[in-house]
Amino acid sequence: MFQKVEGIVIRTTDYGETNKIVTIFSRELGKISAMARGAKKPKSRLASVSQLMTHGHFLIQMGSGLGTLQQGEIISTMKEIREDIFLTAYASFIVELTDKATEDKKHNPYLFEMLYQTLHYMCEGVDSEVLSLIYQTKMLPVLGMRPYFDTCAICHQETDFVAFSVREGGFLCSRHAEQDPYRIPVGEAVHKLLRLFFHFDLHRLGNVSVKDSTKKQMRLVLNTYYDEYCGIYLKSRRFLEQLDKFQI
């Protein structure tokens, strides 16, 4: 059976001397993998369409196991991302998180649209670090995680938030922050932005400007929470940390 899908390449794996296994997150079927025979050959008709982060239409011969990519038509190569090391790093984080957080052939058009919109914004010049933070926040419920972003994790009141507790699973107000000695102190902007990112419609994203110190706190909160409850290891996250460390 042949299936035509619209999708974005989220992973490629070399297979033998000339072939690739291409993993695509599609609008119609969710995550699917297919053998792209000869795709490593420069003159192959599948060479360009099987590149990481390529957005296109793909014709796949489906089977009980691994499908076979027959042909593809490029919608966008995400050229702006490929030409910038920082954009490539953040986009790689986003597609790897999508890959690790999803199961094969689980239809999720909302997630496809979020992935497409995030990469599209990145190509348009929206702050790539902020986009990665938004995406990481919005992936929490996909992974079955719902931190307390709206109320204090202990008293469940909407009040002044001064810290984030991984142990309690959310923000803490000034009255209860002392109950977790390992709490992460945060500024008011961190709470407001994480709550906003969790709930808002990504299509409504306008001009966004976030202080570097706020982004750093948000990244610490999200990474620490993911490490505790998710158990996903991302190579791309290590690369991002190295970029930040050496300030390339």
Curated annotation (Swiss-Prot):
It comes from the Bacteria. Keywords: DNA damage, DNA recombination, DNA repair. Pfam families: RecO_C (PF02565), RecO_N (PF11967). GO terms for cellular component: bacterial nucleoid. GO terms for biological process: DNA recombination; double-strand break repair. InterPro entries: ARFGAP/RecO (IPR037278), DNA_rep/recomb_RecO_N (IPR022572), NA-bd_OB-fold (IPR012340), RecO (IPR003717), RecO_C (IPR042242). The keyword Lipid biosynthesis does not apply. Gene3D superfamilies: Nucleic acid-binding proteins (2.40.50.140), Recombination protein O, C-terminal domain (1.20.1440.120). Involved in DNA repair and RecF pathway recombination. Belongs to the RecO family. This is DNA repair protein RecO. It comes from Bacillus cereus (strain G9842).
